[in-house]
A protein has these predicted regions:
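ER/Golgi luminal nucleotide-sugar-dependent glycosyltransferases, focusing on the catalytic module
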Residues: 1-262
């Protein structure tokens, strides 16, 4: 089995090195890394101290802003690099550089071999929800989330002001997409997923050939958690929802505001 790990990194190079070493299986895994354009690549690589050769640092780098379409751009760049490599992968994971596996490689391989056709990706229909908070994320226009300013405090103020203003401005979007004569509801998911190689190629081909995706998600809230879910919902492959047990391990401590999530 061939596995590709697509990793978005922006900080903590030593942890990224540990993550890649933990997931590496000789002859089975390749790694594609996008490093935020604001970070010095050579310095980061030196500190990561990755001693294996099956790691590709992609050259198409973007400045990533949380909640902006820039997240979709680096996701697309990683997918493109993986596909254009010419390697045929059975499975492709998308991870953050701050993740770490809680399963052994043997358990990961065993699960994937036992579920060869399962696409592991979250998706909750928010087009048909009655939750106004969720509807605002897709019906309101979210401008300036990728504004190229380095002052994070100022950027947060601008985003917050625009987001508040758009609640009251009577210019709204449909909470769904129409493409190829079909209505596609918007699904809220996660930036982390694991899909088959064929599924990844379908997603990529749809993204580069159909401009409707960028037109809609460019001004949506946290589009990186929705775009790929919605592309899959127009595919011919039937999707079914399954949730077995907990998806994370949480450890709450009295001294912490938020729990640690693994």
């Amino acid at each position: 089995m061939k596995i590709a790990y697509l990793i978005a990194a922006h900080t903590d190079p030593k942890h990224l090195g540990r993550l890649i070493e933990a997931l590496n299986i000789n002859g089975h895994t390749d790694f594609y890394v996008h490093l935020d354009k604001r970070v010095e690549l050579n310095v980061f690589q030196t500190e990561a101290n990755i001693r294996i050769s099956n790691v590709t640092w992609i050259s198409d780098r973007v400045i990533a802003k949380w909640g902006g379409y820039s997240q979709c751009r680096y996701q697309k760049a990683l997918i493109k690099s993986c596909i254009k490599s010419g390697n045929l992968y059975d499975r492709v994971f998308f991870l953050s550089g701050l993740d770490y596996p809680i399963w052994s490689n043997c358990k990961i391989l065993s699960y994937l071999k036992n579920h060869p056709d399962l696409e592991i990706i979250a998706g909750k229909n928010i087009s048909e929800t009655n939750d106004n908070l969720q509807l605002r994320k897709i019906k309101n226009y979210h401008f300036f989330r990728d504004l190229p300013i380095s002052n994070n405090k100022l950027h947060r103020i601008i985003k917050g002001f625009v987001q508040l203003a758009m609640r009251y401005i009577p210019i709204k979007r449909k909470g769904y997409i129409v493409t190829k004569g079909k209505k596609v509801n918007i699904y809220h998911g996660s930036s982390w997923w694991c899909v088959t190689g064929g599924c990844l190629r379908y997603i990529y081909n749809e993204l580069i050939s159909n401009p409707v995706w960028e037109q809609f998600f460019k001004f949506a809230y946290t589009p990186g958690k929705r775009l790929h879910d919605d592309v899959l919902h127009i595919s011919k492959k039937p999707l079914r929802g399954e949730l077995s047990g907990f998806l994370s391990i949480c450890q709450a401590e009295a001294s912490c505001i938020s729990p640690k999530v693994y």
